[in-house]
């Protein structure tokens, strides 16, 4: 979903779930022969971003309110679990507008701080897209977390903490540095990014990401 599309598809407007183009099963074999093409399959950052030494960084840029991110999550999660040990995978929630992006970013970082991402990440997606829960107001967030076995009041405290707000601001800086204009998108080693809209489909973007990881490993 492109940045410009978000204003027309905010929460509570009956977001549909779709992934755009699909059926690119031949992509991995083609890439193995020729490699992905800059400008067609991926974008090279004009200003590379610093990454932690020792591992190849892969960043999942997402928004809980994005139907494409929700549909992509099972494939992405399965792919991420099979990444080599020298690859570090992390998620970064985007903030293309003030709200509800800011609230959703802080939900993610509060879950991360509490060690609940694995348990709750897909539940947040499902609540928004299957149950039409906006999760944009404190009472909604608290009730949802309580319903799912967490202390709702404590969650709001963590969500509004300085550390979580700092991480949310840093996430916006990372998103801007990568010049992400739509999600889902994948950043590779601070040098490249790809997405379904760039590569042709989200499955094809994963194949491109595999090749960019190989490229980053070579230096």
Question: Where are each of the predicted segments found?
Answer:
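Extracytoplasmic thiol/disulfide redox context detector
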Residues: 2-98, 214-219
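C-terminal cap of thioredoxin/glutaredoxin-like
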Residues: 5, 147-219
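Solvent-exposed, acidic/flexible segments
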Residues: 55, 65-72, 97-104, 113, ...
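Sec/Tat-exported extracytoplasmic proteins
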Residues: 65, 70, 80-83, 111-115, ...
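Alpha-helical elements of Rossmann-like donor-binding domains used by nucleotide-donor carbohydrate transfer enzymes
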Residues: 75-78, 106, 123, 140, ...
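Structural microenvironment flanking redox-active thiols in thiol-disulfide oxidoreductases
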Residues: 83-146
